[in-house]
Amino acid sequence: MARTIIAGNWKMNHGPRETREFVAGMKEKYQTPPAVETVICPPFVSISDLVNESPEWLKTGAQNVYFEESGAFTGEVSPKMLAELGVEYVIIGHSERRNIFAESDEEVNKKVRIALKYGIKPIICVGESDAQRNEGKTLEVVENQVKSALSEVVSDTLQNVVFAYEPVWAIGSGKAATGEDAEQVCKHIRSVISELNSSVADDIPVLYGGSVKPENLEEFMDQDNINGALVGGKSLVAETYCQLLEVARRFPGDEG
């Protein structure tokens, strides 16, 4: 059984001071671990504060990584640097990276492989655009993204991968997929993984992302193949993030 994860993607929000305030709010709410894998992915400048201030159960992620270990790559951050900071997760292939920064499937794959090399768990984002959805190509698009992301991934590291289904049309729009629609895609993601390695497919967390909030999280968590959520705006405030954790903890998964 896959573990339950609620991951927060802060995008370009919260500097060091706001990060420390968030952690203080989390520690005030939970004196003991909330029985859900909790991951926050802040901007690069706030990673050290999150690592240093957080209790052990509050995991730190990054929002991006470069696929080279070092060199003349102005503005980039290597997986070695992230690992040294204590980063445990990294979001790879988010639609904003793909669309705004023209990140290709090939680059996503390179980032996945080098993150795994350094022991960082990639949260691989896949999802269709509104046009692809209207053309009935959702499963085809997502399958191709999954296969490309996992190309040449060493089999004994596959269990460290996390997938997040984020329909592009739902991100930041206030429009979420239905639980049934998200389940159909997440089930397909798991079946594609099973074709590559059936022994780990059931243990890989598959998350839903796209206008997730405390009021609709239960609809997604109630599905057989959804193990949590990748959350944007509703993860910025400790109180709201804790509300998400309270919903998620009612759906037990593997404790990891």
Curated annotation (Swiss-Prot):
InterPro entries recorded: Aldolase_TIM (IPR013785), TIM_sf (IPR035990), TrioseP_Isoase_bac/euk (IPR022896), Triosephosphate_isomerase (IPR000652), Triosephosphate_isomerase_AS (IPR020861)
Main location as per UniProt: cytoplasm
CDD domains: TIM (cd00311)
Residues annotated as catalytic: 94, 166
GO molecular function, one term: triose-phosphate isomerase activity
Enzyme kind, highest EC tier: isomerase
Subcellular location: Cytoplasm
EC number assigned by the record: 5.3.1.1
SUPFAM superfamilies: Triosephosphate isomerase (TIM) (SSF51351)
List of residues binding substrate: 9-11, 172, 211, 232-233
Gene Ontology cellular-component annotations: cytosol
PANTHER family per record: TRIOSEPHOSPHATE ISOMERASE
Subunit structure: Homodimer.
Annotated NCBIfam families: tim
Protein name, UniProt field: Triosephosphate isomerase
Organism field: Natranaerobius thermophilus (strain ATCC BAA-1301 / DSM 18059 / JW/NM-WN-LF)
